[in-house]
A protein has these predicted regions:
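Membrane-integral, polyisoprenol-dependent glycosyltransferases
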Residues: 2-387, 574-577
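Membrane-embedded architecture of ER/inner-membrane glycosylation machinery
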Residues: 2, 8, 15, 184, ...
Length: 600
């Protein structure tokens, strides 16, 4: 990796050349890291296949207003992510990599926002380091290769925050404010975020910018008057409101987001907004959904894992940034930029810590702030004649090595509990150990080299962890292969039904609607549902049922003649197989190995 430039430039030509070089470094290194992670692998978990299925339905039906999943209204997320995926499907075909491409592009855009902020507010070295620290941490790498909305939300909110803060960073008077054009642009970005994940796309950036601008404006009034009192605080609130132009931001947001929200509300008779706002916003905040719960420190602990390897130095960075903001270290623009990073990080962490439903990806919009803080303090430390806070440095390097050991141990333990044949993926844990040794060896010989070693460690570790290592782990994702076996049995595309449990993975890989014979759909369980499932099998040789093994006995009395278990696989972390039940035309027919006959 090229050395990170550290010295300020003195001419306009040199300045532009330095910016172009640092921009090219960020783009090239980010694309390389993201590309390594694009190993072909099936869609994971519940969200990826569900969202991809919604996008594919949009493309197939031409209805880009009302999201639908398996023939039902999908109310869990707004439409921007689905639009992005459907566009990628139209350009590159409906496969897993196309579904994940929008998240990767959004991650690159968020990295460029950090490059811009770090370069303008601190130095080109800080911009490069912040961008690559963001790309080269674990959770960002995972979300950059996931068919989910979080990376898109993070890019939109990061750009909105950076563009809104820029005019106020170096302002020395209370009259500084966003231009009308900039305020509308910030509002448009918030509108995209609202189209991506709902009200949080506006509430999050507004809370960050409002609190930060209020503090800056109050500080300006205190500096001018020499007094600290209610007048300065209240006056600062007014100055911040004027500076941010909230009405213009609101107009920009509504111009982007309101047309679709109005259209989907009209098309669904109010059903979509009722389900989304009442259930998936208020409901998720008030009570845990889908057993996603955690304590108040859930997101703090989760960030120490998700921001690895840079989390090894995040606590020190937060403490040092707080000291500089409180005690006046450095210039005013740098102090304000550090204050923005602290507020940015705190608002997202605290806000989602108060929510009853918790998932690590909820606070992904805080990760740009963490990257900016760590980069600013790391670059500054490299410029000192000796390392400040050597004990913290030692603790960080040791944590880096231990993180590698923990990575390997986690994979090895998981391989004994469902991740079959994944042991080789544990080798990715060697990278942080090697990186820690390199940082320690270079700490006094070349501080810039030590920082570059940490940057490379993050990029290589993250790229391999979400690429080749994840590809190895993906062999345990059994349901996609089971659905493909159903298609092979049908001699083309199977018509699938699930008894009694359906999953988004089955729906996506079914390439069509999957019928469901579930407990909640009938009065007489299991007889009524089993009889209906058996009737489905009689409808043709391309009809295949997916049944958990412990439900075969309930189904068996109702099955038609010449029925067999034509395939079975055990999904990840399940305690039983999922079976394919199909029909065959004569006694000698079979698919692959001889089927286990249920009825002759």
């Amino acid at each position: 990796m090229p050395s990170i430039p550290h010295h300020p430039v003195t001419t306009s030509t040199a300045h532009h050349a330095d910016r172009r070089g640092s921009w090219a470094l960020v783009v090239g290194a980010s694309i390389a890291c993201l590309a390594v992670g694009f190993a072909p692998m099936p869609l994971w978990d519940e969200d990826e296949p569900r969202f991809a299925a919604i996008a594919r339905t949009m493309l197939a039906t031409g209805d880009w207003v009302v999201p639908s999943y398996n023939g039902t209204l999908a109310v869990d997320k707004p439409v921007l992510m689905h639009w992005c995926m459907a566009t990628a499907f139209a350009l590159f075909g409906p496969d897993e990599r196309a579904a994940r491409l929008p998240a990767a592009v959004a991650t690159l855009l968020a990295a460029l926002a950090l490059w811009r902020a770090g370069s303008r507010w601190f130095s080109p070295a800080t911009g490069v380091t912040a961008a690559l620290a963001f790309v080269g941490c674990l959770l960002v790498g995972i979300e950059a290769h996931a068919a989910t909305p979080d990376a898109i939300l993070t890019a939109a909110t990061a750009w909105a925050t950076v563009l809104a803060a820029e005019p106020l960073i170096a302002a020395t008077s209370a009259t500084a404010r966003l231009s009308m054009r900039r305020a509308l642009a910030v509002g448009g970005l918030c509108g995209l975020a609202v189209l991506c994940k709902g009200p949080i796309g506006l509430v999050g950036p507004a809370a960050v910018l409002g609190l930060w601008a209020w503090g800056c404006a109050a500080g300006t009034r205190v500096a001018a008057s020499g007094q600290r009192g209610p007048r300065e605080v209240i006056g600062g609130l007014w100055d911040a409101t004027v500076a941010l132009r909230p009405l213009a931001i609101g107009v920009g947001m509504l111009a982007v987001a309101a047309p679709w929200y109005a259209a989907v509300s009209i098309r669904t008779g109010g059903e979509w907004p009722a389900g989304f706002f009442l259930v998936h916003n208020i409901g998720r905040f008030a009570a845990p959904m889908e057993n996603h719960r955690g304590g108040l420190l859930f997101h703090v602990v989760g960030m120490l894992v998700g921001f690895f390897p840079w989390s090894c130095f995040l606590p020190l960075s937060v403490v040092l940034a707080g000291r500089r903001v409180a005690h006046g270290g450095g210039g005013l623009p740098q102090r304000r930029a550090l204050a923005l990073g602290l507020v940015w990080l705190t608002v997202w962490l605290v806000g989602f810590s108060l929510s009853a439903t918790k998932l690590p990806n909820y606070v992904l919009p805080a990760y740009p702030a963490a990257a900016l803080l760590v980069a600013a303090l790391a670059v500054d430390a490299c410029r000192q004649t000796t390392w400040p806070h050597p004990r913290w440095l030692t603790a960080g390097v040791v944590s880096l090595a231990l993180g590698g050991v923990a990575t390997a141990a986690t994979v090895l333990v998981a391989s004994r509990h469902g991740l079959s044949d994944a042991e080789a993926a544990a080798a990715v844990g060697i990278i942080p150990v090697v990186g820690a040794l390199a940082c320690w060896w270079l700490r006094n010989r070349s501080p810039n080299g030590a920082l570059a070693a940490l940057v490379v460690t993050g990029l290589v570790y993250t790229g391999l962890a979400v690429g080749p290592a994840a590809r190895r782990i993906a062999t345990s994702n059994a349901l996609p292969e089971l659905v493909e076996a159903a298609h092979r049995h049908a001699g083309g595309t199977a018509r699938l039904a699930a008894f009694p449990q359906n999953t988004p993975t089955i729906v996506y890989y079914a390439r069509g609607q999957v019928r469901e014979y579930a407990r909640e759909q009938v009065r007489d369980w299991p007889a009524e549902a089993a009889a209906a499932a058996a009737d489905f099998l009689r409808s043709g040789p391309d009809a295949v049922l997916i049944v958990p093994a412990d439900h075969l006995t309930a189904l068996e009395p109702f099955l038609p003649p010449r029925t067999a278990v034509v395939g079975r696989r055990r999904p990840l972390f399940k305690d039983q197989d999922f079976c394919l039940v199909g029909t065959f035309p004569d006694a000698g027919a079979a698919v692959g190995k001889a089927p286990a006959r249920l009825h002759r």
